[in-house]
Amino acid sequence: MLFAVGDPQADDNFVFEPYNVNNSISVAANLREAFKKSELLQSGYKHALVAIDAPTMLVPLDEYREQDAETLYKHTLKWQRSEDILTSTMPKLNAVAVFAVSKDLKMVVDNHFENIQVQPQMQAVWTHLYKYAFAGIRQKLFAYFHDKRMEVIRFQRNRFEFCNSYVANSTQDILYYLLYVWKLMGMDRGDNELYLAGNVPNRDELCTELQQFVNRYHVLEVATDFNNAAMATQKEIPYDLKALYLG
């Protein structure tokens, strides 16, 4: 869990505060404790953007119907009665993200801020990677690594064509899933590109293996990925937060 405030793009005025969670209690209970201890949370801010790491269903914007979102989510992903189903519209990506958040967690946030916006943690990453999707003539597949997971994304015709999450425990698992999607999307035919972003595990080993199957792959270096902003060089700040502030 972490908290941040500021505008690093304007003046490098940015405060970043990680919070060590107690895994024996819920996220909501941890947040209640954080409000008692965190100087940042006690600073009197009225508005908050909450990024939730949660399974997310993506619906094309032109097919989205608000009245159907909850039913579709419950038939697609696991849902508990203790959760509220929320949505976040992404006009640039022509999609609506549908996801669930603990009612207790949302209540804690609502009790401390006058205005809140909730979105999936991946939303900032999707928006940032989308900027690369249509640069040049080659088709592109993206793999983003975080928290022992790999998110594989492909954009086509200004929208998502593929988006899925995989457990990334080993180089062989990563390679298997990547090459499966690479072939599924028909990218093994032609001079296409693979982009790797985030905390790439076993980077050298993975790149060595990829050379056998993918002619063009790129590992996005964080500093240059975010135009060498001062915030981008801080390793303790996760990629998704950099994408949110700098993307």
Region locations from a protein language model:
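Hydrophobic/aromatic-enriched cytosolic interaction surfaces used to assemble or bind macromolecules
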Residues: 1-247
